[in-house]
Amino acid sequence: MDVLSDIKHRIYPRPFERLSNLRGRKNLVGAEIGVAGGEHAHSLLKTLDIQKMYLIDPYEMYAEYEEGKLHYGVDQLALSTTEIFARERLTEYSDQILWIRQLSSSALPSISERLDFVYIDGNHQEKFVTEDIDNYWPLLSNGGVIGGHDYYNGFQREHDGVVKAVTSFVVKNGLQLRVELPDWWIEN
């Protein structure tokens, strides 16, 4: 990715929080799967009226994660450092956030209420994106939004799993998919 593309890729707020039906709603409860350095969580907390936000990220290497990330130089030390940066970045919102340091599939019992939104930016392999959508869609409140990052079709092969999983879910359930790169979302 060239420098200009990388800068555009990291611009906040992202389309998800700018264009979905979340703007103007009060006391939102949501979740972000795949927090990384906390940049997007910070943008969500700054942009939207969020009462509570579950931040879900294991910050640990696991077999399927390693397959996709080792070529980026990601190792356990990098993940631990990223977690420290995320926690520092989000300190001002500590009364609004609940950290869940687990895989998203293991985090489900920790969520005790309906969610107004779920933002998925975890493992980009098709099976994991499918699992996240299937697991978290039923937790959405009426009018809730599920969406995520990296909906790139064709020109970034490492994100093909996102496109396949999202498209399959939308077609299978007769839903309307909204896309503004790099984000996608579906309103319940």
Regions found by a protein language model. Give the residues of each.
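Conserved SAM-binding loop and adjacent beta-strand
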Residues: 1-14
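S-adenosylmethionine/decaboxylated-SAM
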Residues: 2, 17-188
